[in-house]
Each structure stands twice: as C-alpha cells, then as structure tokens.
Amino acid sequence: LVAGGHVLLEGVPGLGKTLLVRSLGRVLELDFNRIQFTPDLMPTDVTGHAMYDQKTEQFRIRRGPAFTQLLLADEINRAPAKTQAALLEVMQERQITIEGKAFTLNEPYMVLATQNPLDQEGTYPLPEAELDRFLFKVLIDYPGHDDETRLVNMVLDGTIRASLDVDSLSPATDAAGLQAMKALSNDVLIDAE
C-alpha cells in the first residue's frame, strides 16, 4: 500500500489467504470489497455498468465492487481472460470507465488477488499484461508440522474461533495515515550504488 503496488497471493485453497486480506482491510480501516472469481463472472460484475431507469427514463451508473479502496480478487485465475482483463484499467490507472465516462478511484487503492496453482482443475493462467501490474507475488504454502499441530490443538480446545474473528481486530491506521506514510516514503533516498 505504501509503495502503491498490488499483490498476488498464490496457494492451494484453505491456507487463509482470504482471511489475511479481510484482516488487513479491518486493521487499516479501508473500504473493502471481495469478488469471488468464477468461470461465469462477467467484466461488468467487477466494474459495474450503465442501467436504464424507467422512472427517470435515463441511464444511471451501477458501481461494481471494484469501487473500493482494498479489493480482494479471490481466486482470480478461475475466471476467463475477458473477466480478468476488467482489472487492467483498475490496477494501472486506478480508474474505471463505464459508457465512456472515467471514474477515479479513492486513494489509497490496492488489489490483493488470490490464485490457485495452475495445476488445480478449473484455473486459467493470468495474462502477462495482468501479471505485470502486480508489484510482487507471495507464495503461501502449507504450515510446517509444529504449526499444523498447534492449529489442530486450537481447533480441539475451541480457541481457534477467537483467532479467526476479524471483527475483534483493532484498527492500526486509516486511509489518511496510509497517505501520510506514502508521502514520507517518497522522500526516502536510494543510493545509486
């Protein structure tokens, strides 16, 4: 968020990728939306569309879930390329164009996308143009033996539920705080050597 980039999280289902992003939205107090990418998801389901209002006899814009500050594109590689491409303008320009009108998105803006490994059934490879828009990719693997044993014990003794409660998390900052951090990061000098 401070660097202004987007993140791709990769791992098999069930490792907590979605919970991680929901938790991030909570502690940063950002507007948060989640889109579950599926094979039948259409581009307008992501960005929104113009809708005719019979009462006013005019078109009105129905904003899609991409109109937010923190967007979770869950299992992005389960949707066909046409739907994945709906995020290209969102990620690069931080705007959405509907019926020729451009809508600027609120800052800070970040897409956190999860994807399943390509060897999983029902997945599509992300196009190069989309991969280029991610600042980095994080690989999430199965927990080690000790961590998995600890998780099993938490399930058995009932303490796991409290650990998974996103609503119990306290905000650490907000959009203004993030914007201030971003401004400070612009002043960091990087040695050419």
Predicted stretch roles:
Residues 12, 46, 114:
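P-loop (Walker A) phosphate-binding loop of NTP-binding proteins
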Residues 159-193:
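Basic, amphipathic alpha-helical bundle interface domains used for macromolecular binding and assembly
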Residues 60-69, 98-115, 126-135:
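AAA+/SF3 P-loop NTPase mechanochemical coupling elements
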Residues 2-38:
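Walker A/P-loop
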Residues 27-55:
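AAA+/P-loop NTPase substrate/partner-engagement loops
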Residues 30, 124-141, 159-162:
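A short helix-turn-beta junction within AAA+ P-loop NTPase domains corresponding to the substrate/partner-engaging
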Residues 36-41, 136-147, 167-169:
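Conserved AAA+ ATPase "SRH/arginine-finger" region at the nucleotide-binding site
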Residues 67-92, 121-130, 142-151:
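Conserved AAA+/SF3 P-loop NTPase catalytic/coupling segment centered on the Walker-B
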